[in-house]
UniProtKB/Swiss-Prot annotation:
Cofactor(s), by name: Mg(2+)
Gene3D superfamilies attached to this UniProt entry: ATP-grasp fold, A domain, ATP-grasp fold, B domain, Succinyl-CoA synthetase domains
General function of this protein: Succinyl-CoA synthetase functions in the citric acid cycle (TCA), coupling the hydrolysis of succinyl-CoA to the synthesis of either ATP or GTP and thus represents the only step of substrate-level phosphorylation in the TCA. The beta subunit provides nucleotide specificity of the enzyme and binds the substrate succinate, while the binding sites for coenzyme A and phosphate are found in the alpha subunit.
Entry's Gene Ontology cellular component terms: cytosol; succinate-CoA ligase complex
Residues that bind substrate: 264, 321-323
Subunit composition and interactions: Heterotetramer of two alpha and two beta subunits.
Domain (ATP-grasp): residue spans on this chain: 9-244
Pathway: Carbohydrate metabolism; tricarboxylic acid cycle; succinate from succinyl-CoA (ligase route): step 1/1
Cofactor note: Binds 1 Mg(2+) ion per subunit.
UniProt name for this protein: Succinate--CoA ligase [ADP-forming] subunit beta
Length: 388
């Protein structure tokens, strides 16, 4: 689950980290009032969506009057913001963050993720702030500085000082950076985060450090023990198909291809997507129905896949272990009838009751293509998607 920038900054402020004075508003009139409350002669207004690249898309603007802030809010509230990180439909804007203007001297980067290889929280820092950090890591990896956090003792001040010196900070800036570093580490652990970024972390004209942005992603597996963060969830930012899948305990991720995939098991699902790619196809989704798939869940999975207008064919790849292939076959037949599937469906069944499942499909009289192997399934579904 992601948080909006204004929500992330609220958490930063609770941990004593330096953030701009600002207000999240949902009407143009409130935007003008926020400028009055903040004071000054210049403000930054930002459309709040769960995506980066807002500035280039016109979703961030420096304004010099309350009227301009009001006009910006009127222009964006209720609209959809399309950036390089969203799909073609963009994300709906229901909040505008109005905050004080910051005089920037230099931009840095500071972030943290859970590193699976070391099984530790790893902090990353760079002098290349304000830009796409993935691009920096790819083109100039030597500019990415790292600090690994020991889970037994947590982040230590000396680690913050080491990073500060490597970033070229000096004097009181080292103390400020260490305070921010330790505070972010505590925030990361307290709230079960999966990713945290301050991009940019800026050095202001007066030499002080300031958190100018906040990006927070929470580990969904830990949401049951984070009621405060659950209350911050903005469902308008969710993909409706992914939200539908979550209700049925289906693991679904929308992609940009035209071949729908329904598989039981995450590993098999990834392998299925790979072999579809290998044979020239493009998966439209990742969908794992899980080991305890039921007829109802298979039906809902079909509904989710077919809600994507780009899907031209569906590949169902089931390995029967816990789940019986004949039951899956009945679910497929029920779903095809209930949903009214008009596109080709290729099915590969292996394992528990696979032969019985194949017979159930054959006796159904429906236009379902049976595959003899995974390779055959991939080849058949790619041909079907191409209309061959």
């Amino acid at each position: 689950m992601n948080l909006h920038e204004y929500q992330g900054k609220q958490l930063f402020a609770e941990y004593g980290l330096p953030v701009s004075k600002g207000f999240a508003v949902d009407t143009p009139e409130e935007a003008a009032e926020a400028c009055e409350k903040i004071g000054g002669s210049e403000w930054v207004v930002k459309a709040q969506v769960h995506a980066g690249g807002r500035g280039k898309a016109g979703g961030v603007k420096l304004v010099k009057s309350k009227e301009d802030a009001k006009a910006f809010a009127a222009n964006w509230l209720g609209k959809r913001l399309v950036t390089y990180q969203t799909d073609a439909n963009g994300q709906p804007v229901s909040k505008i963050l109005v905050e004080s203007c910051t005089d920037i001297a230099k931009e840095l980067y500071l972030g943290a993720v859970v590193d699976r290889s070391s099984r530790r929280i790893v902090f990353m820092a760079s002098t290349e702030g304000g830009v796409d950090i993935e691009k920096v890591a790819h083109e100039t990896p030597e500019k990415i500085l790292k600090a690994t956090i020991d889970p037994l003792v947590g982040a230590q001040p000396y680690q913050g000082r080491e990073l500060a010196f490597q970033l070229g900070l000096e004097g009181d800036q080292v103390k400020q950076f260490t305070h921010i570093f330790v505070g972010l580490a505590k925030l990361f652990q307290d709230y079960d985060l999966a990713l945290l970024e301050v991009n940019p972390l800026v050095i202001k004209a007066d030499g002080n450090l300031h958190c100018l942005d906040a990006k927070i992603n929470i580990d969904s597996n830990a949401m049951y023990r984070q009621p405060k963060l659950r209350a911050m969830h903005d469902p308008s930012q969710d993909d409706p198909r992914e939200a539908h899948a979550q209700k049925w305990e289906l693991n679904y991720v929308a992609l940009e291809g035209n071949i729908g995939c329904m598989v039981n098991g995450a590993g098999l699902a990834m392998g299925t997507m790979d072999i579809v790619n290998l044979h020239g196809g493009q998966p439209a989704n990742f969908l794992d129905v899980g080991g305890g798939a039921t007829k109802e869940r298979v039906t809902e999975a079909f509904k989710i896949i077919l809600s994507d207008d780009n899907v031209k064919a569906v590949l169902v790849n089931i390995f029967g272990g816990i789940v019986r292939c004949d039951m899956i076959a009945e679910g497929i037949i029920g779903a095809v009838k209930e949903v009214g599937v008009k596109i080709p469906v290729v099915v590969r069944l292996e394992g528990n009751n696979a032969e019985l499942g194949a017979k159930v499909l054959a006796d159904s009289g429906l236009n379902i293509i049976a595959a003899t192997s995974l390779t055959d399934a991939a080849q058949q579904v790619v041909k079907a998607a191409e209309g061959k």
